[in-house]
């Protein structure tokens, strides 16, 4: 899975690109002048996530399948925990928790193991978890929130 940015990303967008790719055990790449076809070639037959900007800050995630079809997009504002600086990413795929249309879209796109909300406490302490709520998506590691996307919009194509 490839995570990339807009053509001229800000420092915050590059940071989110790196964090997201490390969290989902994917690859991060600076886009530069590449078009969609070239990005799909670099994705090596896998799905693609493009981080777009709004006023110089990361503000949209667009999710593409292997053929380059846009599946869905999220508009958001981001938040980072101070715990993030000292967190070591294991490279293991995270688990997925949550209900609703966005959680279902994530399940289809990522193919991560789904965990029921009432079973989150039973996960091993070193687990990474994506918790999809109605208003936010929380990326958790070792039981703590590492970064969060506060949702502003969701569009399915």
Swiss-Prot record:
PROSITE patterns registered for this protein in UniProt: BRIX
UniProt name for this protein: Probable Brix domain-containing ribosomal biogenesis protein
Function comment: Probably involved in the biogenesis of the ribosome.
Species, as recorded: Methanosarcina barkeri (strain Fusaro / DSM 804)
Top-level taxon of origin: Archaea
GO molecular function, one term: rRNA binding
Brix domain residues: 1-157
Keywords per UniProt: Ribosome biogenesis
UniProt xrefs under SMART domains: Brix
Keyword Isomerase belongs to the record: no
Keyword Magnesium belongs to the record: no
GO biological process terms on file: rRNA processing
